[in-house]
A protein has these predicted regions:
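Bacterial N-terminal signal peptides
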Residues: 9-17
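Sec/Tat signal peptide C-region and signal peptidase I cleavage site
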Residues: 17-23
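An extracytoplasmic/periplasmic, membrane-proximal ligand-sensing/linker region
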Residues: 29-31, 214, 265-326
């Protein structure tokens, strides 16, 4: 009798294993949700929709974008952190996944253990801009003024803790130059005042500033990217500025695709392979290029390394400066 019971348990366990394996083999067989934890229309939302549009063709299922804004992305991110790790609930996020919990505090999750990186998606550099008639011609000029007259030169950003703000603080920390940072609620409001001559300089995302630059309303000084961009071939990078402290400087807003932690390896592999197809598709590449962004897939390990670098370079600076929301 005991032998029969034992055999029954073994058979039941094998059946369960076979069922689980079969379920994973069928993945995906129902709609997938991609969380964009910010309001519609922003960089994260647009990125999520471009990905969803092509991912549905690659995977053969409906892919929906869900916007849950609030707490600078932490509310929507927490929804995914608490979801089943079955590949049907995904998250598009950025550097802010690491930075925002430090700035706002009391994050409902630990990003290091709550999420599974899947692939890098795209990156957009920041650009330092001034008015066309500004005497500041180069990044070296900008740094020199910040060193010789600390705090005299004002510079606008798009808000406390944004990538634009972080770029200013990283530059200041690296060079010892000091500026009066004027925090606006969004790039648009900042650009209006810079164009009007109310503030002499601004750090903005290239995709936000490119229209003003092309129209001649703002002049680009330098880019925070690793290399020059096709849209502005004559604009040097921070690394090319001749300022020795900036010789290795690169910092961009990057986005990535994540799932909840503990995703099955085969589901992770299917999603990663699908993302490689999506991000190397000429249509997707062009859609991102039109937004001055560079589409580039990565391995899960490479995306994890990017987050770790953010944690080791930016987070200590945020803590040192005591940056908190206004």
């Amino acid at each position: 009798m005991r032998i029969k019971a034992a055999l029954f348990c073994v058979a039941l366990a094998l059946a369960g294993f076979a069922f689980a394996a079969q379920a994973q083999d069928k993945y995906p067989d129902k709609p997938i949700r991609i969380m964009a934890p910010y309001a519609p229309g922003g960089n994260i939302d647009v990125t999520a929709r471009i990905i969803a549009d092509k991912l549905k063709d690659v995977l053969g299922v409906t892919v929906l974008v869900d916007n849950k804004a609030g707490a600078s992305g932490m509310i929507g991110s927490d929804v995914i952190a608490r979801s089943a790790p079955d590949g049907y609930n995904l998250l598009v996020s950025a550097n802010s996944l690491v930075d925002i919990p430090v700035i706002y505090g009391n994050a409902p999750y630990d990003w290091k253990t709550a999420f599974q990186p899947i692939s890098h998606i795209q990156a957009v550099p920041a650009v330092l801009v001034v008015t066309p008639d500004s005497p500041i011609k180069t990044l070296a000029d900008f740094v020199r003024i910040g060193r010789e007259t600390p705090g005299k030169l004002a510079i606008a950003d798009s808000g406390v803790g944004t990538t634009n703000h972080i770029v200013i603080e990283l530059l200041s920390d690296a060079t010892g130059a000091k500026y009066t940072v004027v925090h606006y609620k969004g790039s648009g409001a900042a650009s209006i005042d810079v164009i009007a001559g109310q503030v002499p300089a601004q750090v903005d995302q290239l995709n936000s500033a490119i229209g003003h630059i092309k129209a001649g309303k703002l002049r680009a000084i330098a880019l925070s990217s690793d290399k020059r961009v096709p849209e502005l071939p004559d604009v040097p990078t921070f690394k090319e500025s001749g300022v020795k402290e900036l010789a290795g400087f690169t910092y961009s807003t990057y986005t990535g695709l994540f799932g909840p932690a503990k995703m099955p390896p085969d589901v992770l592999a299917k999603l990663h392979d699908a993302m490689v197809k999506v991000l190397t598709d000429p249509t997707t590449v062009k859609r991102f290029a039109d937004l001055t962004a560079e589409a580039s897939p990565s391995t899960p390990q490479e995306l994890a390394a990017m987050l770790d670098k953010e944690d080791s370079t930016v987070v200590p600076l945020l803590k040192k400066l005591g940056i908190k929301p206004e």
